[in-house]
């Protein structure tokens, strides 16, 4: 189970915190020793897309750790003051320079061992033009038969692509929820 215990000082006053269970709660939280502020640690949202152009799926070769040199869908951490949809579009532009029309949600994947929830949306690219950003070594379109399955960066990417291609073959897309160990 993911347990970072990373809050050492209060964000409100700067005093040290201690982990203990607040009254009427059922788990330990970082509590300020001076002002009593309770700090909650919650999962981080990762948002991304499955961009498609003329039947091919866009993948990005990672230029950052973790998993530098492995292929991924364009995705990243959601920022404050943006929706999941806005974050997915932003990450697609930042990582691949792809212009897209966002479609519906495809996968919602719980990744509790790293404290994350991943949301991937289907997307149609408006052109094949790509302009990868600094986090990407290369961005490229792949037919299903060309997907480098053994070189994918994360299990969430593999699961999302498997669901996408299965739905596409069936001719009907659904929203898929899964827990990733």
Q: Where are the regions a protein language model picked out?
A:
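Beta-strand-connecting loop/turn residues
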Residues: 28, 54-56, 128
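A generic fold-level signal
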Residues: 5, 27, 44, 52, ...
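Unchanged
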Residues: 78-101, 105-163, 167, 171-174, ...
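Active-site donor-binding loop signature of nucleotide-sugar glycosyltransferases
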Residues: 34, 62, 75, 123, ...
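Conserved hydrophobic "DFG−1" position in protein kinase catalytic cores
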Residues: 51-52, 59, 123, 141
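A generic structural signal for short beta-strands and their flanking turns/coil linkers
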Residues: 28, 45-47, 67-69, 98-101, ...
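Acidic, metal-coordinating catalytic segment for phosphate/diphosphate chemistry
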Residues: 2-48
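Conserved Nudix-box catalytic region and its N-terminal flanking loop in Nudix hydrolases
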Residues: 52-94
């Amino acid at each position: 189970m993911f347990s970072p215990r990373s809050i050492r000082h209060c964000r409100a006053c700067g005093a040290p915190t201690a982990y203990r269970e607040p009254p009427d709660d059922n788990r330990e939280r970082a509590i300020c020793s001076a002002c009593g502020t309770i700090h909650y640690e919650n999962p981080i949202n990762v948002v991304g897309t499955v961009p498609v152009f003329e039947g091919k799926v866009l993948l990005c070769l990672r230029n950052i750790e973790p998993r530098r040199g492995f292929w991924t869908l364009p995705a990243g951490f959601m920022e404050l003051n943006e929706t999941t949809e806005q974050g997915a579009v932003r990450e697609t532009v930042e990582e691949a320079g792809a212009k897209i029309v966002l479609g519906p949600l495809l996968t919602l994947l719980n990744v509790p061992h790293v404290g994350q929830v991943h949301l991937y949306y289907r997307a149609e690219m408006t052109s094949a033009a790509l302009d990868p950003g600094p986090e990407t070594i290369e961005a490229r379109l792949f037919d299903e038969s060309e997907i480098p399955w053994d070189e994918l960066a994360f299990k969430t990417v593999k699961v999302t692509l498997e669901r996408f291609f299965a739905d596409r073959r069936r001719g009907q897309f659904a929203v898929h929820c899964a827990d990733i160990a």
